[in-house]
Amino acid sequence: PAPGQPALPAPQQEWHSQLMLTAMIAAAKADGHVDERERSLIEAELQRQQADDEERRWLEAQLRKPLDPADVARAAVGQAPALAAEVYLDSLVVSDDTSFMERAYLDELARRLQLPAALKQDLETQARSG
């Protein structure tokens, strides 16, 4: 959880972790491939989550299957607004939005997450500033 936020119950934490990884994977794949930088960011998140072998197999399956912004957004819409913002921010961090395909993916994800334009811009500024 973010600093100052309470820890989620175990089942919710697992769901949240998978959602964030799914968002990162989908953003990385938006241009048709996952490059070395994107893969290392995803691997770092897996390590942070102390992933086991089953979770690593899940990751490999996710990397092979087609993902789209509708699937990612569907899990977040209707939850706390902060979750949609977190999904978008994690997607921004892993993607290189200079690619036309990744930019198009991010714009569609933001639309499906129903992010207000000002929040979308704030998150993009936050992601660029590191």
Short names for language-model regions:
Residues 1-25, 38-130:
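Small-residue-enriched hydrophobic alpha-helices in membranes
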